Amino acid sequence: MSNPLFLGEVSKRRTFAIISHPDAGKTTITEKVLLFGNAIQKAGTVKGRGNAQHAKSDWMEMEKERGISVTTSVMQFPYNDCLVNLLDTPGHEDFSEDTYRTLTAVDSCLMVIDAAKGVEDRTRKLMEVTRLRDTPIVTFMNKLDRDVRDPMEVLDEVENELGMMCAPITWPIGCGKEFKGVYHIHRDETILYESGHGHEIQEVRIIKGLDNPELDEKVGESLAASVREELELVMGACPEFDHEAFLVGELTPVYFGTALGNFGVDHMLDGLTEWAPAPKTRQAVERDVEATEDKFSGFVFKIQANMDPKHRDRIAFMRIVSGTYTQGMKMNHVRLGKQVSISDAVTFMAGDRSRAEHAYAGDIIGLHNHGTIQIGDTFTQGEALKFSGIPNFAPELFRRIRLKDPLKQKQLLKGLVQLSEEGAVQVFRPLQNNDLIVGAVGVLQFDVVVARLKSEYNVEAIYEGVNVATARWVECGDAKKLDEFQRKNQTNLALDGGDNLTYIAPTMVNLNLAQERFPDIDFRATREH
């Protein structure tokens, strides 16, 4: 029987990720969430002047230079009566694979939308991934301190394009230079906008009731009248917030504000901590695992090399699914069938690491990894479980990688295998030659790999074009047919970083022909870890 203290710890966990299109203001929101959670004293904005603070969650050198989040960071902080685990995900075009995998480790998501632009391409793609698990979504319409589109129009777009009903919780009063604040529909109060920057959280003035004459006085009669009119429309056209519909991903509560101006983020956090689910039941291949089970279980969704330049180590990020982690406990590393003792797990505040003494279902902990842990690995207190749904995506872009100094082949291979294990890039070794082919989902990943090979492995490498259009993992239940396929397709076959057989196609036509000629072979565009 689970004890009340443990159940209390699990029920106050809220584990969520932020998803958005690049430049919708995600990193700024992350900062301000941490600021309101008192996790940092000063929010560092990303694209600042030369001496500006760098954002707390962007801690790798290249991220600091470019002002983009390249890797997923994990930050934990208390808010209201909850303990929040925030997983920051790369917002830049090119880092989708890491982001997809991170979405498998959360119980809810915050979707950030630039209110001037509405629903953008990257947001659509990420929402497809959240759909697979019916993840509950809270929405924050950002940048109200700039000129934005008609809010009603943007809500319609979310409903039509993402298939979710929108229930506004707050509503903007003006925008751009005329932005005066928001009306909180649930609390029946107007919160007036005062711009706060960096680490200043402004005292806000609150006006009770929509018909309060003080509202006309503060925002002007004509704006007050038009807001009352708008709200009448909104109340008629939009559904009321329905908690059940939210929990199955059918309805999203919507908040308005400006992350840069420190305004509206706290309203959103209040809603998220009140409504988002505590850690949920999760499917393993063998059975469903409840978060409140006594016995520990967890899965690895990301591996990060060299988080600490002073220690050239790797950290495996593990989502705890059930039970409690205690320092020094023994666990079963299921894939290897090995008992391991974990005494030095870490908890995260982006880049600052502190030793974890206890962690509970819903928490993310870091395990020191010396090459034995892979993405998708499960750890339990004995039971052989395998959690499903942690995807690997076939790359869309390919380059041949070559050394400037041929004597460093060993270091190059080691670096590439480590980077592929953490999901930064995929590596393919053709069966018929000694080439090393790197595959990625976006161009920027190639730059990241070369930069990291240089700074972490002291290897200088350059890229060349390669005649590869796409790759597919190949599988077949019939060993004889697989052998025949291998014999006839030697020139197109390679092994990936995990030694899985892969078909490398110079053109899509070539791939289609191979699929026609070998109907018994399964050509897969995704592979579970």
Curated annotation (Swiss-Prot):
Source domain of life: Bacteria
An annotated GO cellular component: cytosol
Domain tr-type G: 11-280
CDD domains in alphabetical order: RF3 (cd04169), RF3_II (cd03689), RF3_III (cd16259)
Signal sequence interval, chain numbering: none
Purpose of the protein: Increases the formation of ribosomal termination complexes and stimulates activities of RF-1 and RF-2. It binds guanine nucleotides and has strong preference for UGA stop codons. It may interact directly with the ribosome. The stimulation of RF-1 and RF-2 is significantly reduced by GTP and GDP, but not by GMP.
Name of the protein in question: Peptide chain release factor 3
Organism: Vibrio campbellii (strain ATCC BAA-1116)
Gene name tied to this protein: prfC
